[in-house]
């Protein structure tokens, strides 16, 4: 089984948290709301990977003013590829508390939507298991 280390920013701006809705046809959590983030590439440092993933998925214009390592978790997930293939992967999630100076987001093709969500509204979103676990651990659910 393949192993992946995933960096996940929990991005907050003015009391709201950034959630991204995954594309319906790909990824580990198709069609569900999640934190952004992605895999650490060979030879890449953890914070470099986090900043790269944010640029790739959320755009250059989202400015982070704070990045603080927070917690980690792991599990086994089935990834669905655009061509329909499936793969089981052992996932290690490194989760960071982040604060952004703005809400200027430009999502890439991995996502179909995004939202800045106040903690009291998180229950109204179809969150994937990993995001639900993270937000519960943070005391937001």
Curated annotation (Swiss-Prot):
Residues 1-141 form the Nudix hydrolase domain. It catalyses: a ribonucleoside 5'-triphosphate + H2O = a ribonucleoside 5'-phosphate + diphosphate + H(+); a 2'-deoxyribonucleoside 5'-triphosphate + H2O = a 2'-deoxyribonucleoside 5'-phosphate + diphosphate + H(+); dUTP + H2O = dUMP + diphosphate + H(+); dTTP + H2O = dTMP + diphosphate + H(+). A motif (Nudix box) lies at residues 38-59. The keyword DNA repair does not apply. GO terms for molecular function: dCTP diphosphatase activity; dTTP diphosphatase activity; dUTP diphosphatase activity; magnesium ion binding. Its cofactor is Mg(2+). Keywords: Hydrolase, Magnesium. InterPro entries: Nucleoside_triphosphatase_NudI, Nudix_hydrolase, NUDIX_hydrolase-like_dom_sf, NUDIX_hydrolase_CS, NUDIX_hydrolase_dom. It holds the Pfam family NUDIX. It comes from the Bacteria. Its EC number is 3.6.1.9, 3.6.1.12, 3.6.1.-, 3.6.1.23. Belongs to the Nudix hydrolase family. NudI subfamily. HAMAP family: Nudix_NudI. NCBIfam families: PRK15472.1. PANTHER family: GDP-MANNOSE MANNOSYL HYDROLASE (PTHR43046), MUTT_NUDIX FAMILY PROTEIN (PTHR43046:SF14). Catalyzes the hydrolysis of nucleoside triphosphates, with a preference for pyrimidine deoxynucleoside triphosphates (dUTP, dTTP and dCTP). Monomer. This is Nucleoside triphosphatase NudI. It comes from Escherichia coli O6:H1 (strain CFT073 / ATCC 700928 / UPEC). The gene is nudI.
